[in-house]
């Protein structure tokens, strides 16, 4: 079996359930648990992109995948709270479960929401991706967690920094205490854009002077195409927001390069599946 473990993540196979865990977050395993699902046979899609319901069997399979992953990290899948993810910069604070005996998925309360924060124990915050960046946040001082989806549109809106700002302004966190872990996503090697998107990035990130920084953005030699490192952009703006360099932990894994184990929209096209990132504060 291919092992995705590296200096920042460990690849676990528990009773046939595969997932990654960040070594940094494992240092706090008495307080939190977390996972990023691995495998393209699992699919955590709970609704169509246009909000249409899934066929019953497909939804049931997603719930089974959630249950198996949650069981592997010893949390109750019925406590899953999932944002609907519409490439916004909106972040919710979850203070309680809404559905009593079912996961909180496809709820109007989390429509047009791409990030979620809580200080409540046992809630299992979930986001999903197939190339987009997912960020897990943890403040060990205030016992605050967050889970944020940042596609290229979310990155343009700086949703990662807005998550930090909400943790600071509304829940009493300090940026220097916050840990941010970046899950597998499409990387610069495969994130190719046309001039219209390139121009949007240049305009939004003038402060980074990205047009002159080939580590962030690089024009292809023979085409009007550009490769952009959205992960690096998030690292830089999070550091500017006050996070310590050593507290920004990157999985270093590209979804396209690892398409045999991680879902990728660019590889799978219309029938693409979704992986999930979970994080939960443990109860007493």
Task: Indicate residue ranges for each PLM-predicted region.
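Active-site microenvironment for binding and transforming phosphate-containing groups
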Residues: 1-284
